[in-house]
Swiss-Prot record:
Pfam families: Metallothio
Name of the featured protein: Metallothionein
Region (Alpha): 29-60
Positions annotated to bind a divalent metal cation 3: 14, 18, 23, 28
Domain notes: Class I metallothioneins contain 2 metal-binding domains: four divalent ions are chelated within cluster A of the alpha domain and are coordinated via cysteinyl thiolate bridges to 11 cysteine ligands. Cluster B, the corresponding region within the beta domain, can ligate three divalent ions to 9 cysteines.
GO terms for MF: metal ion binding
Keywords on record: Metal-binding, Metal-thiolate cluster
Protein family according to the UniProt entry: Belongs to the metallothionein superfamily. Type 1 family.
Annotated a divalent metal cation 2 binding sites: 6, 12, 14, 25
Organism expressing this protein natively: Lithognathus mormyrus
Region listing for Beta, in residue ranges: 1-28
Known function: Metallothioneins have a high content of cysteine residues that bind various heavy metals.
Protein backbone atom coordinates (compact mmCIF):
# COMPACT_ATOMS: atom_id res chain seq x y z
CA UNK A 1 0.00 0.00 0.00
CA UNK A 2 1.32 3.40 -0.96
CA UNK A 3 1.79 5.44 2.23
CA UNK A 4 1.28 8.64 0.26
CA UNK A 5 -2.03 10.33 -0.29
CA UNK A 6 -1.06 11.40 -3.81
CA UNK A 7 -3.74 9.44 -5.59
CA UNK A 8 -6.45 10.68 -3.25
CA UNK A 9 -5.57 14.30 -2.63
CA UNK A 10 -3.12 15.31 -5.35
CA UNK A 11 -0.65 16.41 -2.68
CA UNK A 12 2.34 14.68 -1.17
CA UNK A 13 4.21 16.14 1.77
CA UNK A 14 5.72 13.04 3.34
CA UNK A 15 9.32 12.38 4.32
CA UNK A 16 12.17 10.28 2.99
CA UNK A 17 10.50 7.01 3.94
CA UNK A 18 7.64 7.70 1.57
CA UNK A 19 7.55 6.27 -1.94
CA UNK A 20 4.91 7.45 -4.38
CA UNK A 21 4.03 4.91 -7.03
CA UNK A 22 2.30 7.37 -9.34
CA UNK A 23 3.69 10.83 -9.87
CA UNK A 24 0.44 12.50 -10.83
CA UNK A 25 0.44 14.45 -7.59
CA UNK A 26 0.92 18.18 -8.00
CA UNK A 27 3.04 18.93 -4.95
CA UNK A 28 5.54 16.07 -4.71
CA UNK A 29 8.73 16.63 -2.81
CA UNK A 30 12.04 15.23 -4.05
CA UNK A 31 12.20 12.76 -1.18
CA UNK A 32 8.71 11.56 -1.89
CA UNK A 33 8.40 11.01 -5.63
CA UNK A 34 10.78 9.67 -8.23
CA UNK A 35 9.87 12.46 -10.65
CA UNK A 36 12.41 14.54 -8.75
CA UNK A 37 15.53 12.38 -9.11
CA UNK A 38 18.03 12.22 -6.25
CA UNK A 39 20.77 14.75 -6.81
CA UNK A 40 18.65 16.93 -9.08
CA UNK A 41 19.54 20.47 -8.01
CA UNK A 42 16.52 21.88 -9.83
CA UNK A 43 14.29 19.80 -7.57
CA UNK A 44 16.22 20.22 -4.33
CA UNK A 45 14.09 23.03 -2.93
CA UNK A 46 10.82 21.13 -2.75
CA UNK A 47 9.46 22.49 -6.02
CA UNK A 48 6.48 20.99 -7.79
CA UNK A 49 7.43 18.13 -10.07
CA UNK A 50 6.20 18.05 -13.63
CA UNK A 51 8.70 15.70 -15.27
CA UNK A 52 10.73 12.58 -14.62
CA UNK A 53 14.20 13.75 -15.63
CA UNK A 54 16.68 16.26 -14.21
CA UNK A 55 16.43 18.98 -16.83
CA UNK A 56 14.52 22.21 -17.39
CA UNK A 57 11.23 20.31 -17.57
CA UNK A 58 11.81 18.53 -14.27
CA UNK A 59 10.07 21.13 -12.14
CA UNK A 60 7.92 24.19 -12.58
Amino acid sequence: MDPCECAKTGTCNCGGSCSCTNCSCTSCKKSCCSCCPAGCSKCASGCVCKGKTCDTSCCQ
